[in-house]
Design a protein with these regions (language model features):
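Conserved beta-propeller blade repeats
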Residues: 52-53, 112
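Beta-rich carbohydrate-recognition and catalytic domains
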Residues: 1-47, 55-107, 116-162
């Protein structure tokens, strides 16, 4: 989950667990660790890492996240962990950056959601905006794993969200 620090400036990613079938409320959740799982450290992340989405591939936990606040611009990064507590970024650059000026995601590529389909393919759904959040679009890209994480453009891209 993502939460701000006590000064309400930096958004950081923490980890928690709860028993199956619990409400995962304040009294049901338990911290995974004392430390923060991921905090903004790179220039493009600004003061915010949020919207964590994970997928497990070959025993590694990949965490996709939005870096920087909405439309400042937000871009998508990726970190990896063997234990779900200690994460390292796969790159110092965004995995999915904002688009060029005038494109559907020039203000933001953010709020990722990772999904593995029945065939084992992994897709990353995310939102984009070209007008500082007045209009939002949803896109889907396929993720390939190997010696590095690669994003492939898929057949569904930049559909307007109602």
């Amino acid at each position: 989950f993502a939460s701000r620090d006590q000064a309400l400036r930096n958004h950081k990613i923490w980890g928690a667990w709860a028993k199956c079938h619990s409400v995962f409320g304040r009294n049901a959740g338990h911290p995974l660790a004392e430390q923060i799982l991921l905090m903004p450290e790179l220039a493009w992340e600004g003061d915010c890492v949020e919207a964590p989405a994970t997928v497990v591939e070959d025993g590694q936990i990949y965490l996709f996240y939005g870096g920087s606040y909405n439309c400042t611009p937000q871009q998508i990064g990726c970190a990896v962990s063997e234990d779900g507590i200690f994460f390292r970024r796969v790159s110092n650059e965004p995995l999915i950056p904002c688009g060029a000026p005038g494109t559907w995601n020039s203000s933001e590529s953010g709020h990722p959601y990772a999904f593995r389909d029945d065939d084992g393919r992994v897709f990353l759904f995310y939102q984009g905006s070209s007008d500082n959040g007045k209009t939002w679009y949803i896109s889907r890209k396929e993720v390939h794993f190997g010696s590095s994480v690669r994003i492939l453009t898929s057949e569904v891209d930049a559909r307007e969200s109602k």
